[in-house]
């Protein structure tokens, strides 16, 4: 199974270009409380099986976590469920922060 991946520089480029995609932070509530990528929606990993009908079919779904490991597995799970437009953010929010890109606080 081939998991599609992009790096943080590519994600930043797509954000700046206004590309049409959805970005999900699949970390825990406690992790997300410390910051989230701009424009991301929080969807805790354990809830993914219950949200299958919510994933768009017509645009890329980019998933990330802390390091890219959990989101890689989540992308694999989605592929197994027949959702082929899931993309993993390699390196996760750690790589994003190391590159000096902005992190937002979660809107209350």
Spans of features found by a protein language model:
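Rhodanese-like catalytic fold shared by cysteine-dependent sulfurtransferases
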Residues: 1-22, 28-60, 69-108
